[in-house]
Amino acid sequence: MKMKAYAKINIALDAIGKREDNYHLLRMIMQTVDLYDVIDIEKSNDSNISISCNKHYVPTDERNLAYKAAVLFRDEFNIKDGVKINIKKNIPVAAGMAGGSTNAAAVLVIMNKLFNVNASLEVLKEIGLKIGADVPYCIEGGTALCEGIGEIITPLKPFENKILVVLKPNFGVSTKEVYTNLDINKIRKHVNIEGLIQAMENDDLDYVSKNMKNVLENVTLKKHTILKNIKEDMRKSGALGAMMSGSGPTVFAFFDDMLTAQRAFEFLKGKYKYSDVYITRTINSNNL
């Protein structure tokens, strides 16, 4: 059984506090984009969970979130059968686009169908939260306000068909490290989430592009100053606005029209030769 597992961007990311377990309390606007991995799962003749992937640098053992998802799903529903999971990877790794989380989400959804468990999406989200904070959102997809550590999800009016260029530099970032180095007391200006939601409901891409904000830039951009240059180059190439997604290092920019986006894509691909550059669009849902 095969399924597309879509990437996400953060149109807003704010940190407003900390839980006792040191997890940050967040307010985020999440958005699915039309960039995806393909997850293919079949039952195996033994009780093993095996993973294969078209990218050699992706772990195929218990470090992979897809593996963790399969283990948790089997444990939850007392399933003894093994599964073979194939991941066709297109979403960049360690990029702030929930590549691992969306794979885990797809595994839960596929196994739910494959084994005729018929668990509700809410139950799948509860399992997903044990894997990672982004997994519940990846099960739901679309345009959403995510709060708590990301598990409290409020669907928003779809903000679809917006053109964007996405650039993932040739290095990864540790999400854990970024959050460890984030000092909430030093956040001078919090994100106007309500203003952004209103603008998105009004389909005002210009306002959204100029007012989107990610407080994690305070950490990642200090360590990787090249990201400032990428944002500036995107703006100079005609972007309405540019921002880092998640903990980074991926930077994305919204564009008014495909021609300007195409020119920016060519320029960025030429200048940042060892980076992954994509043109994509926002989409309504991940169709999970």
Curated annotation (Swiss-Prot):
Q: What are its E.C. numbers?
A: 2.7.1.148
Which keywords belong to this entry? Answer: ATP-binding, Isoprene biosynthesis, Kinase, Nucleotide-binding, Transferase
Q: Which Gene Ontology terms describe the biological processes this protein takes part in? A: isopentenyl diphosphate biosynthetic process, methylerythritol 4-phosphate pathway; terpenoid biosynthetic process
What InterPro entries has UniProt attached to this entry? GHMP_kinase_C_dom, GHMP_kinase_C_sf, GHMP_kinase_N_dom, IspE, Ribosomal_Su5_D2-typ_SF, Ribsml_uS5_D2-typ_fold_subgr
Q: Which residues form the active site?
A: 8, 134
MF terms (GO), sorted A to Z:
4-(cytidine 5'-diphospho)-2-C-methyl-D-erythritol kinase activity; ATP binding
Its biological purpose is as follows: Catalyzes the phosphorylation of the position 2 hydroxy group of 4-diphosphocytidyl-2C-methyl-D-erythritol.
SUPFAM superfamilies reported for this sequence:
GHMP Kinase, C-terminal domain, Ribosomal protein S5 domain 2-like
Return the Pfam families for the record: GHMP_kinases_C, GHMP_kinases_N
What gene does the UniProt entry assign to this protein?
ispE
Protein's name according to its UniProt entry? 4-diphosphocytidyl-2-C-methyl-D-erythritol kinase
Enumerate the residues binding ATP: 92-102
Q: In which pathway does it act?
A: Isoprenoid biosynthesis; isopentenyl diphosphate biosynthesis via DXP pathway; isopentenyl diphosphate from 1-deoxy-D-xylulose 5-phosphate: step 3/6
UniProt family annotation: Belongs to the GHMP kinase family. IspE subfamily.
Protein source organism:
Clostridium perfringens (strain ATCC 13124 / DSM 756 / JCM 1290 / NCIMB 6125 / NCTC 8237 / Type A)
What reactions does this protein catalyze? 4-CDP-2-C-methyl-D-erythritol + ATP = 4-CDP-2-C-methyl-D-erythritol 2-phosphate + ADP + H(+)
